[in-house]
Regions:
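Acidic, Ser/Thr-rich low-complexity segments on the non-lumenal side of membrane proteins
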Residues: 2-34
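Tandem CBS (Bateman) regulatory domains
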Residues: 1-3, 16-21, 38-92, 97-123
Length: 123
């Protein structure tokens, strides 16, 4: 089981960029509410649309992508991969039946699965 962290919609863009994204070398994050419910995905590239002097007063919820249906635990890698491509994100949230974020699929984890399948199938 891998560690994953989320950010709060109330977090400032400055906190997301300087305290989450750059230290973790992760340019996107899943946004949740206080109960762990999925809210959206925030991207450093979208922070670039906001003047940097406003980063400390602009919330992640103001710039996050909200039009996503999070993945369920029963979904296949192919289903999640298609949604990631459609959304233009490198990460995708996975939620339980109550809508709480329980994990994150990354583009790198999908590459790892595909490479593993190729190796085990003699590809």
């Amino acid at each position: 089981k891998r560690e994953f962290r989320t950010v709060a919609g109330t977090d400032s863009i400055a906190d997301f960029v300087w305290q989450f994204a750059f230290p973790r070398k992760q340019l996107e994050a899943v946004v949740t509410d206080d109960d762990g419910q999925f809210q959206g995905i925030v991207k450093v590239s979208d922070a670039g649309d906001v003047d940097q002097d406003q980063w400390s007063t602009t919330r992640c919820s103001d710039i996050m992508i909200q039009e996503l249906s999070p993945a369920r635990l029963s979904w296949t890698v192919r289903e999640v991969s298609a949604l990631m491509e459609e959304a233009g994100t490198d990460i995708y949230p996975v939620v339980d039946t109550a809508g709480r974020v329980v994990g994150v699929v990354t583009d790198q984890s999908i590459v790892n699965v595909v490479e593993l399948l190729d190796e085990t199938q003699g590809g």
